[in-house]
């Protein structure tokens, strides 16, 4: 998964919609660099993230995206005090993550962006 990761402090995870990319957050995320660790991934198959093999790959569904998101967060040691900022397709992924990992979540924000 392609992503950028900048700053220190409690992590803020920005999740974009579908079809979109981390570019959605280009004017918002930098406002938090001085106070938080800001992580902005490109979900699988979007933005600069790798495309999966095969046109009909079964991981291009909600369950597949959720699996990749969880593996990604573990790989960069995101485990507690998480602030989620979610939009569109990222809302479903983020809300499921929050429901199943409520002890790790500090806050959540659902956004409506054009």
Question: Where does each model-flagged region fall?
Answer:
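Conserved hydrolase catalytic core segment
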Residues: 35, 79-114
């Amino acid at each position: 998964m392609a992503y950028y990761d900048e700053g220190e402090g409690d992590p803020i995870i920005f999740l974009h919609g579908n079809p979109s990319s981390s570019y959605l957050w280009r004017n918002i995320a930098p406002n938090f660099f001085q106070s938080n660790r800001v992580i902005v991934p490109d979900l699988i198959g979007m933005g600069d993230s790798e495309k999966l093999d095969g046109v009909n790959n079964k991981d291009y569904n909600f369950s597949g995206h959720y699996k990749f998101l969880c593996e990604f967060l573990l790989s960069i040691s995101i485990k507690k005090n998480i602030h989620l900022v979610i939009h569109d397709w990222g809302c479903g992924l983020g809300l499921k993550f929050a429901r199943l990992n409520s002890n790790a979540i500090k806050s959540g924000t659902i956004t409506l962006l054009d």
